[in-house]
Each structure stands twice: as C-alpha cells, then as structure tokens.
Amino acid sequence: MAPGKAPAGHFSILYFAAASTFTGKTSEHLPAPVRARHVFTMLEERYPGIGDKVLSSCAVTVNLEYVDIGEEDAEQQIEEGDEVAIIPPVSSG
C-alpha cells in the first residue's frame, strides 16, 4: 500500500527496512485514537513475532518527532490522521 492520507478514524503507519520486510508492507492504516504504548501491541497481534524480532530495537516517530514508546511518551495519544514510522537500526559498513 502506498503511503497516503489515512481514512477517517485511522492513522498511517510507515515501515522501513526490517519492519517492512517482516510485515510485507511499506505502510498501512490502523484505527485511531490509540495510546502510543498500544501501537506495538496492535502490531504484535497482526504480525506475531514482530515485537521480539523487529520492534524491540526500533526507533519510532509520530508526525516526524521521535517518541519513546516504553517510557515518557507511552501515554501519547495517536490521533486520526497522524503518521507513525517504525525505523529499525541502520548499519553501515
């Protein structure tokens, strides 16, 4: 699915690198509103195993701002129309 405006009542989630490979998608739309801490739970329900294999080492942005889902930003509300990105670590050589 190409990134685009989320339908009413949804937010967009973008997958990069290993997250895209694991899900088989570059993006999708999920129901909103939801607390940031529940995004990983939603993804684990859709893609069993993604938590340990991918999400445990990922950075997350909400509307281009980095958030810490496991800490102080866990209660941040993801609203309709927001954009969440799942960004695995990038290695260089």
Swiss-Prot record:
SUPFAM superfamilies: MoaD/ThiS. The modification 1-thioglycine is found at residue 93. C-terminal thiocarboxylation occurs in 2 steps, it is first acyl-adenylated (-COAMP) via the hesA/moeB/thiF part of uba4, then thiocarboxylated (-COSH) via the rhodanese domain of uba4. GO terms for cellular component: molybdopterin adenylyltransferase complex; molybdopterin synthase complex. Its main location: cytoplasm. Pathway: Cofactor biosynthesis; molybdopterin biosynthesis. Keywords: Cytoplasm, Molybdenum cofactor biosynthesis, Nucleotide-binding, Phosphoprotein. Belongs to the MoaD family. MOCS2A subfamily. This is Molybdopterin synthase sulfur carrier subunit. The gene is cnxG.
